[in-house]
């Protein structure tokens, strides 16, 4: 396995990471937990160090299933791996039954609650990389970045990133608290990217 350092952060990750969304969200029924636990152990043995999840990767009955799965399966390897998870989307449970739509929520109080939930579910005392999953048009980037600076100072988050944001948003947030990663969806088979 090859490894990379993300930007100037010093955060070293495997060149290939394991995105975990499909294990319990979006692509049919959740995968078998025992099989996924074995897969995680195999991935670590192969040199994978970067594992990506989000607080909203789950099912209607267990909306945080993916983080719980990672927390259980990767606990024995915690000192060897980098865990990335995401905040900024919440389930709109105003209807009585799911599937529940996701709505952006990056208010500081929501971020603080989200980080505590992710830490508990992932069975860790810190998050290596914490992404803003989607931009909340009701919250200024400086307010989000200020909250991240606070969480970094507390040691709960080591690095942070932003997913699917425009240049102006990234620049404004970065001025307040330096961003390690800008997460963009690219597909290897596409030859042209905007």
How would you describe each model-predicted region?
Residues 31-43, 107-120, 168-170:
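Short, acidic/polar
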Residues 91-105:
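Surface-exposed, active-site-proximal loop segments in enzymatic domains
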Residues 13-17, 49-50, 80-84, 126-129, ...:
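Structural preference for beta-strand elements that scaffold enzyme active sites
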Residues 1-82:
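N-terminal binding-site loop/beta-alpha segment at the start of enzyme catalytic domains
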Residues 63-74, 96, 123, 138-149, ...:
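Distinct, well-ordered alpha-helical segments
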Residues 184-193:
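Conserved small/polar residues in nucleotide/adenosyl-binding loops
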Residues 119-136:
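Active-site groove signature of glycoside hydrolases
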Residues 21, 56, 86-90, 132-135, ...:
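Active-site beta-loop-alpha junctions enriched in small/polar residues
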């Amino acid at each position: 396995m090859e490894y990379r350092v993300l930007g100037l952060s010093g955060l070293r990750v495997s060149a290939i990471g394991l995105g975990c969304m499909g294990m319990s969200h979006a692509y049919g029924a959740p995968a078998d937990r025992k099989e996924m636990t074995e897969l995680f152990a195999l991935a670590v043995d192969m040199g994978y160090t970067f594992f990506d999840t989000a607080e909203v990767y789950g099912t209607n009955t267990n909306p945080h299933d993916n983080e719980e799965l990672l927390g259980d399966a990767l606990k024995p390897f915690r000192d060897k791996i980098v865990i990335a998870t995401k905040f900024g989307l919440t389930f709109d449970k105003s209807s009585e039954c799911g599937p529940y739509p996701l709505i952006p929520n990056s208010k500081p109080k929501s971020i603080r609650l989200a980080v505590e939930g992710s830490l508990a579910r992932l069975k860790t005392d810190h998050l290596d990389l914490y992404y803003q999953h989607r931009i909340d048009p009701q919250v200024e980037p400086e307010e989000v970045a200020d909250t991240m600076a606070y969480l970094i100072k507390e040691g709960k988050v080591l690095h942070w990133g932003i997913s699917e944001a425009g240049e102006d948003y990234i620049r404004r947030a970065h001025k307040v608290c330096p961003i390690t990663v800008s997460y963009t969806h690219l597909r290897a088979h596409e030859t042209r990217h905007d």
